[in-house]
Amino acid sequence: MNYSIISYILGWVLTIESIFMFIPCIVAAIYREKEGFAFLIVALLCLAIGLLRIRKKTKSQVFYAKEGFVTVALSWIIMSIFGALPFVINQDIPSFTDALFETISGFTTTGASILSDVEALSHCSLFWRSFTHWIGGMGVFVFLLAILPLTGGYNMHLMRAESPGPSVGKFVPKVRETAKILYAIYIVMTLVEIILLLSAGMPLFDSLTVSFGTAGTGGFGIKNTSIADYNMVIQAIISIFMILFGVNFCAYFLLLGNNKKDAFKLEEVHWYLTIIAGAVAIITINTKDMFHNLFTAFHHALFQVASVITTTGYSTTDFDLWPQLSRAVLVIVMFIGACAGSTGGGIKVSRIIILVKSVKQELGYFIHPRSVKVIKMDNKPLSANSIRGVNAFFVTYTLIFVASLLIITFDNFDLVTNFTAVTATLNNIGPGLKLVGPTGNFGIFSPVAKYILMFDMLAGRLELYPILLLFTPSVWKKH
């Protein structure tokens, strides 16, 4: 393990976080809030520590995949610890455990909250909560690689370790250029949503924070009722953008380039949109009597399906009161998640496709034992390593899920609450059902259960392995 280079990169991460943390200070100045001093203190602390480490140049350039995974995992933990400090210092969230839970939930774009009264927070704290979604949505290392000329051949290791999905590719030969393209698309889409929300009558502060949550598919709201208080036009705009941010960003790159036709041929996007359409249709029919007309039922069904499958977590209504069939459909799409290469969480549609095709292949062998069938994605054969990786991910995911469920069950809450709490955190969704539903919160859990759920949030956002490697002794051996 090359500790010096990991420490050097962590220095850059803290420096970048300090720059981000100065923005809530500006918000505090605008609203004349004394809570902004907490952000200023922590921002200066991050900057001082970061600059001290950056100044110490590292000579060794040895950097393998394991260094990439460990660096990313440690970066997200350290970012969350420092990101939680302003909440504790300004007393918006006095408990460090609760503040850390809220911050990890923000950076991992989960949106699970321990707060019962969100509106009691200062504007600068509300802004930071939502801004952590935007930072975490695309990933801090994508941002880092886009603006800094990091050298040494380890850029791709960092990007692969942080990016959501079975694999991450390069749109162009250089990793740094790929990072720039990703962030350019991300920023433009965020700005377009802000403008549309403003034009629909949403106040500027609300437009900014809601757009940050939508872009990062996070779901922290600034109102206790989430998105329910806004008009249907605003809700419809958010619905559309949640779906757009759940699409593989490769599709947008293809649309901007000379391969526009290929963008519409992406198999994962077809499955993603088909699943959304099917889920919306089922829930619309199932809830039409609740909402008294088909259009209103469709409106809420579209919003909640978009919110859940993209793992955003916003809500326009208390879907925990919906019929059992509708609730079951939402739980299913919680697991499926968005597309790989998007800002969404969950298992990912691409993995679901590979799992389904693997099962189909195995069934085919029972009928025709001597047949040779190749699993394809976008008409391209998948390697045995890719298929094995998906299967290993699914097994690891299941083991973490079961272990987490068993541990938090010691708090003695009902099974639906516990099951959906793990589902909501491991898939980075936010709200679950029952006590952790749209009108509930995660403050009910004990400190031990909260730390387990924090682990789940980090594991889910980083695709399991970076966090798990931290607990592997052999990883920490020096080269």
Give, region by region, the residue ranges found by the protein language model.
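Membrane-proximal intracellular helices of multi-pass ion channels
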Residues: 1-479
